[in-house]
Design a protein with these regions (language model features):
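Hydrophobic pocket-lining residues within nucleotide cofactor-binding pockets
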Residues: 12, 38, 103
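Extreme N-terminal starter segment of soluble prokaryotic enzymes
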Residues: 1-5
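Short, surface-exposed acidic-centric catalytic microdomains
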Residues: 20-63
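N-terminal structural module
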Residues: 9, 15, 24-25
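Short beta-strand-to-loop capping motifs
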Residues: 8-10, 55-61, 97-100
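Short, conserved charged micro-motifs
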Residues: 15-17, 61-67, 104-105
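Flexible, gly/pro- and Lys/Arg-enriched active-site loops
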Residues: 43-50, 67, 72-175
């Protein structure tokens, strides 16, 4: 099964929405590796800070079907798609990498995501997938993060709260 790497973000009741999104991913896909959660300033507009994380899943879904499933999850969390592109979000989940695929499709599907140039995607992704390769840059996620101008910024780590016994609130159960 392919591995998909996801970027998760929220700045409206973010702890609840991210926790519930991670739970939904685990319910649908089983084991999910999740990065720590970090606080980042909004990009592209003046808004509340976002909480962002990355997740890795093994999926039986095509990129198009996975994108549709993620949109349904966002919608279930009250995602409003009628506003400007850069705006507050209850939940924003994007497929940033899907194995070594390069693709575009309906529903704003772009793999790899252009947002891979931003710290809010690269930092958490480098934590869980340092060796994953950007299919267009021919560099690893770790290399891209080390070269990023915000690499040395100390972004605040945020805990999502209670988790099942034997797990961390923001990490998958031990293997």
């Amino acid at each position: 099964m392919p591995t998909a790497y996801l970027s998760l973000g929220s700045n409206l009741d973010p702890v609840r929405h991210l926790r519930e999104a991670i739970d939904a991913l685990r319910e649908r896909f089983g084991e999910v590796e999740v990065s720590a959660v970090y606080r980042f300033p909004a990009v592209g507009y003046a808004g509340a800070d976002f909480l962002n994380a990355a997740a890795a899943i093994r999926t039986d879904l095509s990129p198009e079907a996975l994108n549709a499933w993620l949109h349904a999850l966002e919608d279930a969390h009250g995602r409003d798609r009628s506003g400007p592109r850069y705006s507050d979000r209850t939940l924003d989940i994007d497929i940033v990498l899907y194995d070594d695929l390069v693709a575009e499709g309906a529903g704003n599907l772009r793999i790899p995501r252009d947002e891979l140039r931003h710290a809010f995607v690269l930092k958490p992704l480098a934590e869980i997938a340092p060796g994953a390769m950007h299919p267009l840059e021919s560099r690893s996620i770790a290399e891209l993060w080390r070269a990023h101008p915000e690499h040395d910024v100390a972004f605040e780590q945020v805990e999502l709260g209670s988790a099942p016994p034997g797990t961390s609130p923001t990490r998958a159960p031990a293997r």
